[in-house]
Amino acid sequence: MSESKKYEITYIVRPDIDDAAKTALVDRFDKILTDNGAQVIDSKDWSKRRFAYEIGGFNEGTYHIVNLTATDDAALNEFDRLSKINDDILRHMIVKRED
């Protein structure tokens, strides 16, 4: 079995989504990661922040951070694919952690 690597995913949720829908969205994307072999260590809202420029017609959004470990890139690829087509996620970024 290959060694587990640490990753951090940051994504921005549109600001006009209600709390119940945002919770469902976060749960859905956490489940996508775990169903594809990743282990979610931490998944939490960072803050609602104003953008330097408009993204998708919005001037602000809620940043959500997920820390996880994965042995392969299946979970990351599926998260990337589905977040690109989801209208509630304005932007996302996946970073490999070195710590």
Swiss-Prot record:
Belongs to the bacterial ribosomal protein bS6 family. Coiled coil: none annotated. This is Small ribosomal subunit protein bS6. InterPro entries: Ribosomal_bS6, Ribosomal_bS6_sf, Ribosomal_S6_plastid/chlpt, Transl_elong_EF1B/ribsomal_bS6. Keywords: Ribonucleoprotein, Ribosomal protein, RNA-binding, rRNA-binding. It comes from Lactiplantibacillus plantarum (strain ATCC BAA-793 / NCIMB 8826 / WCFS1) (Lactobacillus plantarum). One of its GO terms (cellular component) is cytoplasm. Gene3D superfamilies: 3.30.70.60. Signal peptide: none annotated. It holds the Pfam family Ribosomal_S6. GO terms for biological process: translation. Binds together with bS18 to 16S ribosomal RNA. It comes from the Bacteria. PANTHER family: MITOCHONDRIAL 28S RIBOSOMAL PROTEIN S6, SMALL RIBOSOMAL SUBUNIT PROTEIN BS6M. One of its GO terms (molecular function) is structural constituent of ribosome.
